[in-house]
């Protein structure tokens, strides 16, 4: 670092010195030009001379230039070029006034070459500036960031020795690792594949939601393969200059050929691989030119032996079909959200360098985080570690992990916010309404936690978690989901006798579920098993702006009626449940007003009519028994959870943790009030 700082200082000092030299010569030029100011014509000079207005003259070395001064009040300086044939006669012979001071400039004793020094220095300075500009334009010796290197690839080359990520650092994706391990094995031992006549895939596309570990898998491939690894982002290809993207693609593959066998990884390839179209302006698109060059390099007339292209995207629907065909991206690997077992394995990876207390159960934690991807779980463990440090604890406990889950989902608590008692009451009944309706809806998930403490933009929340990972949502479950979401609004109507803006998000989610049931899932008895509306964008304008409508206005009217019927049915069912269990609604709301937060076990005890004191005594007895059986805790627990091999993980679809918000701070409503 010291050497870099010294170089920076020397570079800045050189720049300042050069600037001072330039300013010096600029000042000399200005002074020289000022000396030549006041130039007059020969006729004017002759007129002044005859009229006795000249006080002194000085004849320069060249014998033609005459400088002088007028005898006016301003002592005006002048300079004139007089023909040599008239110089002696006009000034010396016809001198009208003997008092005029005539002076000859003496010949210079300085060698002529000295007068050339300023010009030589100025030329050297200009040459120096040109050299510095060329060095900067060529990237200063590296980085390919210079003006003259626009066409050079910006891919970063990672050598095998610099790769520290391996497949041991990737968990919860056994099938995905298996697909990529085959690529690694081919790079290490290509002979057995070639003898069998097999062709290794030229390209592998990693597809999946954000945070599932696509880039991490690519890094692991680089670490395991032991070959050069070029990594670049899709956005690095396209610049403001025409032809730069295609040039960079060519340069990237030229570099890869020199380092073959190797791997090229393009992250976020949708930035350059978006489906081609006419575009809004109808003109030529620089991105399309880049894509065309990429298509040619992947499978054209050229031969790219030993080069494997790995790309990642979370938008496979917008990629060009020519890019996805066999021979280019032969294999697409779906990197989805892990199931409960996969989440447990991911958690084991992320707790290697963390100190956990004995009460931490990663299996329980994995079950309580459905829908969490690898990035979410890493963030969860980091939040728990920060909470433990904030509380001055030596280890991370289950309490910190539970709080971290809620923080990741709903945001941090805002206990300091002053809330009016009437608002607390509305929030308590709103959340209690959600919980009671979910409790008595057979297809709803169990309630995990209820709180009226503000978090994020919400004034309270009701969290319910699924008992297991599911791949599908039945019609009955979707209907009960709508009933649970409307429980808060119905509770307000029954208890308060008025409704508020707190259920705005609930209503939005209910409307979305009902509309998807009718238009996408074919769950409408009246309209039948038909999908309404196109699920893809218009190809002509680049697949993102316009959607086609393939149904009539009459059908649109029926769709709206069916959506309204589903929502009304859910509202009536929620109203019936709360009316039948009004005593339980009051009981849960009362405890919420006292404690502000109720766990799932406490909620079940309240609904079943059991006193909370018995539940607390039971929990204290369990904690005491644990404390008696706990052995001495070692500070360093690194390596306890290292073994994550040999686990078979089933790939399931993503399940999201549902939280029903209550009383989100409706800033839009406040702005409307101000406008009124």
From Swiss-Prot:
Record's keyword terms, sorted: ATP-binding, Cell membrane, Hydrolase, Membrane, Metal-binding, Metalloprotease, Nucleotide-binding, Protease, Transmembrane, Transmembrane helix, Zinc
Cytoplasmic side: 1-9, 134-676
A single GO molecular function term of this UniProt record: ATP-dependent peptidase activity
Extracellular side: 31-112
GO biological process terms, semicolon-separated: protein catabolic process; proteolysis
Sequence segments annotated as region (Disordered): 650-676
UniProt-annotated catalytic positions: 431
Signal peptide: none
Enzyme class: hydrolase
Cellular component aspect of the GO annotation: plasma membrane
Residue ranges crossing the lipid bilayer per the database entry: 10-30, 113-133
Cellular location(s): Cell membrane
Membrane topology (UniProt): Multi-pass membrane protein
Parts forming coiled coils: none
Assigned EC number: 3.4.24.-
Cofactor remark from the record: Binds 1 zinc ion per subunit.
Subunit description: Homohexamer.
Family: In the central section; belongs to the AAA ATPase family.
Protein name: ATP-dependent zinc metalloprotease FtsH
Gene, per the UniProt record: ftsH
């Amino acid at each position: 670092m010291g050497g870099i700082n010294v170089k920076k200082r020397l570079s800045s000092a050189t720049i300042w010195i050069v600037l001072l030299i330039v300013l010096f010569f600029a000042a000399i030029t200005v002074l020289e030009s000022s000396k030549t100011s006041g130039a007059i014509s020969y006729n004017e000079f002759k007129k002044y001379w005859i009229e006795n207005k000249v006080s002194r003259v000085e004849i320069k070395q060249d014998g033609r230039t005459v400088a002088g001064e007028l005898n006016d009040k301003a002592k005006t300086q002048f300079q004139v070029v007089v023909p040599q044939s008239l110089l002696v006669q006009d000034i010396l012979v016809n001198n009208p006034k003997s008092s005029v001071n005539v002076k000859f400039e003496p010949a210079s004793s300085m060698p002529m070459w000295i007068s050339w020094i300023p010009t030589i220095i100025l030329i050297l300075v200009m040459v120096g500036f040109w050299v510095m500009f060329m060095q900067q334009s060529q990237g200063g010796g590296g980085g390919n960031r210079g003006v003259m290197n626009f066409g050079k690839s910006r891919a970063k080359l990672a050598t095998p020795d610099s790769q520290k990520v391996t497949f041991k650092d990737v968990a919860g994706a056994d099938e995905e690792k298996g697909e990529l391990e085959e690529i690694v094995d081919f790079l290490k031992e290509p002979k057995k594949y070639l003898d069998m006549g097999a062709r290794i895939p030229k390209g592998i596309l990693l597809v999946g939601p954000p945070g599932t570990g696509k880039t991490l898998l690519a890094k692991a491939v680089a670490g395991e393969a032991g070959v050069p690894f070029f990594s670049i982002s899709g956005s690095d290809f396209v610049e403001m200059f025409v032809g730069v993207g295609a040039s960079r693609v060519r340069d990237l593959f030229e570099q890869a050929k020199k380092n073959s066998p190797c791997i090229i990884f393009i992250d976020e390839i949708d930035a350059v691989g978006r489906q081609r179209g006419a575009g809004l302006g109808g003109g030529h698109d620089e991105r399309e030119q880049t894509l065309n060059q990429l298509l040619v390099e992947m499978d054209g007339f050229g031969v790219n032996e030993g080069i494997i292209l790995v790309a990642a995207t979370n938008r496979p629907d917008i990629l060009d079909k020519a890019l996805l065909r066999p021979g280019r991206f032969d294999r697409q690997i779906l990197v989805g959200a892990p199931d409960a077992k996969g989440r447990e394995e991911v958690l084991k990876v992320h707790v290697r360098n963390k100190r956990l207390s004995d009460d931490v159960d990663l299996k329980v934690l994995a079950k309580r985080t459905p829908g969490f991807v690898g990035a979410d779980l890493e963030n969860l463990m980091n939040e728990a570690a920060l909470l433990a440090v904030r509380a001055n604890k030596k280890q991370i406990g289950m309490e910190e992990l539970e709080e971290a889950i809620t923080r990741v989902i709903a945001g941090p608590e805002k206990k300091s916010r002053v809330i009016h008692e009437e608002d607390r009451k509305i929030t308590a009944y709103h959340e209690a309404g959600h919980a009671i309706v979910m409790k008595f809806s057979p297809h709803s998930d169990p309630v995990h936690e209820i709180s009226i403490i503000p978090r994020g933009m919400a004034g309270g929340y009701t969290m319910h978690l699924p008992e297991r990972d599911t791949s599908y949502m039945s019609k009955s479950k979707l209907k009960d989901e709508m009933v649970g979401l409307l429980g808060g609004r119905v509770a307000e109507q029954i208890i308060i006798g008025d409704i508020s803006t707190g259920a705005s998000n609930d209503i939005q989610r209910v409307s979305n579920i009902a509309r998807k049931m009718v238009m996408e899932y074919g769950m409408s008895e009246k309209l039948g098993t038909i999908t309404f509306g196109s699920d893809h964008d218009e190809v002509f304008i680049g697949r993102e702006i316009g959607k086609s409508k393939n149904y009539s206005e009459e059908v649109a009217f029926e769709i709206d009626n069916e959506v309204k019927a589903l929502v009304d049915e859910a509202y009536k069912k929620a109203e019936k449940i709360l009316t039948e269990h009004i005593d339980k609604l009051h009981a849960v709301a009362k405890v919420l007003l006292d404690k502000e937060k109720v766990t799932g076990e406490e909620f079940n005890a309240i609904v079943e009519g059991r006193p909370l004191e018995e539940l607390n005594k039971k929990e204290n007895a369990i904690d005491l028994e644990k404390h008696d059986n706990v052995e001495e805790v070692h500070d360093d627990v690194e390596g306890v959870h290292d073994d994550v091999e040999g686990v078979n993980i089933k790939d399931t679809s993503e399940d999201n943790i549902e939280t029903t918000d209550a009383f989100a701070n409706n800033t839009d409503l406040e702005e409307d009030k101000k406008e009124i």
